[in-house]
UniProtKB/Swiss-Prot annotation:
GO terms for molecular function: structural constituent of ribosome. InterPro entries: Ribosomal_eL21, Ribosomal_eL21_arc, Ribosomal_eL21_CS, Ribosomal_eL21_sf, Translation_prot_SH3-like_sf. One of its GO terms (cellular component) is ribosome. Disulfide bonds: none annotated. Residues 1-23 are annotated as: Disordered. Residues 7-23 have a biased composition (Basic residues). Belongs to the eukaryotic ribosomal protein eL21 family. It comes from Nanoarchaeum equitans (strain Kin4-M). The keyword Ribonucleoprotein applies. This is Large ribosomal subunit protein eL21.
Amino acid sequence: MVDRKGKGFRRKTRDKLSKHPRQRGKLTITRILQKFNNNDKVAIVIEPSWHYGMPHPRYHGLVGTVVGKRGNCYEVELEFNGEKKLLIVHPAHLKKVG
């Protein structure tokens, strides 16, 4: 084997992108079809079984604001390392906060 570090999208995410046994199975349709309004606060909680519109795992657990909609996904603005970021995230990976 070659001692070379992997550089893929899902590297170092064994715990972050895995579910506990009781949470496994099909994703509920209500989670996929959630609706959000502009200026809603949302948390990015990646759903590992739904790959469409998945943000990079470095943003897992962060809170942002919905700015708009792009197709089936939402534009979420958040601050990361002192910079404003605009992520395009599917609603399966979002949870409303407060």
